[in-house]
């Protein structure tokens, strides 16, 4: 005979109690070389090989960068820090206001279920319309960045030139 009385009701299948997770969201530690104003080389994506200016670290652990668009065609966008090489070239970004740029600014608009169904029924290839607000923001940032870039001779040409490796180049021996 058992020392304790069996319960009147018990589940038909034993359900294991979930263990409490000890994981916590911690902010990402950026490399010491990633400081706002640093010129970066993009390694992947549509703009690979382009030199861009790093503006700000965003909450979702991405970097806010800009070409500037007028110089090399790279718009304001987010980039994962893994896909950049920091160079020793710096640009002053004191005159650039980047307060309004956050994760929500770059978030895609969510479609309702009805809109999704309609889009699936009649698929049409159309170019995405860029909001006028985005274009204005790009112009404001470009104006401030280009003013700083003009202060350094040949920096505009440096940013507009693409980076690539030639035969015999040893990337681990290069000093960026």
Curated annotation (Swiss-Prot):
Keywords of the record: Acetylation, Cytoplasm, Isopeptide bond, Phosphoprotein, Ribonucleoprotein, Ribosomal protein, Ubl conjugation
GO MF, any single term: RNA binding
Subcellular localization, as worded in the UniProt entry: Cytoplasm
InterPro entries: 60S_ribosomal_eL6, Rib_uL2_dom2, Ribosomal_eL6_CS, Ribosomal_eL6_KOW, Translation_prot_SH3-like_sf
SUPFAM superfamilies attached to this UniProt entry: Translation proteins SH3-like domain (SSF50104)
PTM statement from Swiss-Prot or TrEMBL: N-terminally acetylated by acetyltransferase NatA.
Predominant place of localization: cytoplasm
A single BP term in Gene Ontology: cytoplasmic translation
N-acetylserine: residues bearing it: 2
Any single Pfam family the record assigns to this protein: Ribosomal_L6e
Record keyword Cytoplasm present: yes
GO cellular component: cytosol; cytosolic large ribosomal subunit
Cross-link position per record: Glycyl lysine isopeptide (Lys-Gly) (interchain with G-Cter in ubiquitin): 128
Residues bearing PTM Phosphoserine: 12
General function of this protein: Component of the ribosome, a large ribonucleoprotein complex responsible for the synthesis of proteins in the cell. The small ribosomal subunit (SSU) binds messenger RNAs (mRNAs) and translates the encoded message by selecting cognate aminoacyl-transfer RNA (tRNA) molecules. The large subunit (LSU) contains the ribosomal catalytic site termed the peptidyl transferase center (PTC), which catalyzes the formation of peptide bonds, thereby polymerizing the amino acids delivered by tRNAs into a polypeptide chain.
Subunit structure: Component of the large ribosomal subunit (LSU). Mature yeast ribosomes consist of a small (40S) and a large (60S) subunit. The 40S small subunit contains 1 molecule of ribosomal RNA (18S rRNA) and 33 different proteins (encoded by 57 genes). The large 60S subunit contains 3 rRNA molecules (25S, 5.8S and 5S rRNA) and 46 different proteins (encoded by 81 genes).
Note: Present with 37100 molecules/cell in log phase SD medium.
Assigned protein family: Belongs to the eukaryotic ribosomal protein eL6 family.
Protein name, UniProt field: Large ribosomal subunit protein eL6A
Organism the protein comes from: Saccharomyces cerevisiae (strain ATCC 204508 / S288c) (Baker's yeast)
The organism's taxonomic lineage, starting at the top: Eukaryota, Fungi, Dikarya, Ascomycota, Saccharomycotina
Gene name of the encoded protein: RPL6A
């Amino acid at each position: 005979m058992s020392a304790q009385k069996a319960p009147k009701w018990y589940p038909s299948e034993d359900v294991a109690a979930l263990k409490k997770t000890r994981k916590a969201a911690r902010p990402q530690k950026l490399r010491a070389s990633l400081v706002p104003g640093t010129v970066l080389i993009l390694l992947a994506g549509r703009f690979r090989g382009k030199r861009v200016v790093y503006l700000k670290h965003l909450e979702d652990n991405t970097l806010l960068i800009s070409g500037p668009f007028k110089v090399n065609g790279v718009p304001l966008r987010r980039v994962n820090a893994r896909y950049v090489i920091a160079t020793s070239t710096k640009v002053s970004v004191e005159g650039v206001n980047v307060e309004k740029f956050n994760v929500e600014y770059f978030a895609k608009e969510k479609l309702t279920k009805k809109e999704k169904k309609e889009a699936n029924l009649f698929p049409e290839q159309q170019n995405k319309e860029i909001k006028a607000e985005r274009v204005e923001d790009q112009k404001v940032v470009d104006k401030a960045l280009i003013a700083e870039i003009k202060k350094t001779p040949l920096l505009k040409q440096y940013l507009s030139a693409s980076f690539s490796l030639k035969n015999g180049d040893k990337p681990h021996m290069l000093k960026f």
